[in-house]
UniProtKB/Swiss-Prot annotation:
It is found in: Cytoplasm. Residues 17-67, 101-154, 241-293 form the KH domain. The gene is PCBP4. This is Poly(rC)-binding protein 4. Single-stranded nucleic acid binding protein that binds preferentially to oligo dC. It comes from Bos taurus.
Length: 403
């Protein structure tokens, strides 16, 4: 491990705090913790990084490493060499069978994966060639989250160098909008409704009080995802249904549908909303997308579709020098207005800080006013900048708003 430590000493430490999350199986977690916690204690002491491992009896656990860049990379180095040591000690099935490479699975917000892949895959190819490690970005989101798994495998030295380069990319490209963190034990979303109509944030993110949740809604025009409306006491989803319709460019509709409809099915399941994508009209450059459900379901579906669009645009990239087109982005009026807004869910504009929830710097969350045929009073319609694939400007019309 001396060679890796020397590399850490050569690199100047950045004056920032870095948080790296890794997805590990139970056997790997047991190896990192060690007997009576001795191994993880030693890693903490020698690296000076803060290391936490999520609780739970599920097969997978989240290991979170926080600290200075040097501390985090030192901890990753020790973890990689420990896993390599375990592989060397494992009995081989055959004399000529080569042992598998060390593998780490990083958990990264989907909005940052586009920068990691680069235009036409140039960035990830560069990382593979310069580090000698194998890097694979998962095509699908981790369940009930807006994060993806990035798998890094190879010898420990290659993995450490690869993790450095990945961290450099994500530090230069902060996540866009709110991030729904992945938690292996969750099955109903990150924010779940409790029996007293308060929303509790699962995992190591603290608790949001019922009073705060009544005001917690939009971040830059997009609602923070809640649980399925069927979980709300006293709220009958069938009587609270409304619809929103918007347009998505033909060249981006594929990322919303996914391979064999996998992505749109995932969004339907997570949001609880009914999503219909209209047929392509002759000569039209857009497709009609209709979301039907409760305001909460619509807001979550809207957020997840936006995440798909942003990831697709950042991955494909725009034409150099092309100017973005300003597109008005308000949704069309609800087809069926909400009869009576439950007092425990909707309220007037309000801001609270939930930095622990999204794991980022404090960001104000703005309330979503009750559904109405027009834009809410006091809030101006916002616009989205979207560059056309061929660099030309598109005519102004109703568009889906990126977050």
């Amino acid at each position: 491990m001396s060679g890796s430590d020397a590399g850490l000493e050569e690199e100047p430490e950045l004056s920032i705090t870095l948080t790296l999350r890794m997805l590990m199986h139970g056997k790997e977690v047991g190896s990192i913790i060690g007997k009576k916690g001795e191994t993880v204690k030693r890693i903490r002491e020698q690296s000076s990084a803060r290391i936490t491992i999520s609780e739970g009896s599920c097969p997978e656990r989240i290991t979170t490493i926080t600290g200075s860049t040097a501390a985090v990379f030192h901890a990753v180095s020790m973890i990689a060499f420990k896993l390599d040591e375990d592989l060397c000690a494992a009995p081989a099935n055959g004399g000529n069978v080569s042992r598998p490479p060390v593998t780490l699975r990083l958990v990264i917000p989907a909005s940052q994966c586009g920068s990691l892949i680069g235009k036409a895959g140039t960035k990830i190819k560069e990382i593979r060639e310069t580090t000698g490690a194998q890097v694979q970005v998962a095509g699908d989101l981790l369940p009930n989250s807006t994060e993806r798994a990035v798998t890094v495998s190879g010898v420990p030295d290659a993995i450490i160098l690869c993790v450095r380069q990945i961290c450099a990319v994500i530090l230069e490209s902060p996540p866009k909008g709110a991030t729904i963190p992945y938690h292996p034990s969750l099955s109903l979303g990150t924010v779940l409704l409790s029996t007293n109509q308060g929303f509790s944030v699962q995992g190591q993110y603290g608790t949001v009080t019922p009073a705060e949740v009544t005001k917690l809604q939009q971040l830059s025009g997009h609602a923070v995802p809640f649980a399925s409306p069927s979980m709300v006491p006293g709220l009958d989803p069938s009587t609270q249904t409304s619809s929103q319709e918007f347009l998505v460019p033909n060249d981006l509709i594929g990322c919303v549908i996914g391979r064999q409809g996998s992505k749109i099915s995932e969004i339907r399941q997570m949001s609880g909303a009914h999503i219909k994508i209209g047929n392509q009209a002759e000569g039209a450059g857009e497709r009609h997308v209709t979301i039907t459900g409760s305001p909460v379901s619509i807001a979550l579906a809207q957020y997840l579709i936006t995440a798909c669009l942003e990831t697709a645009k950042s991955t494909s990239g725009g034409t150099p020098g092309s100017a973005p087109t300003d597109l008005p982005a308000p949704f069309s009026p609800p087809l069926t207005a909400l009869p009576t807004a439950p007092p425990g869910l909707l309220g007037t504009p309000y801001a609270i800080s939930l930095s622990n929830f999204i794991g980022l710097k404090p960001v104000p969350f703005l309330a979503l006013p009750p559904a109405s045929p027009g834009p809410p009073p006091g809030l101006a319609a916002y616009t989205a900048k979207m560059a056309a694939a061929n660099g030309s400007k598109k005519a102004e019309r109703q568009k889906f708003s990126p977050y």
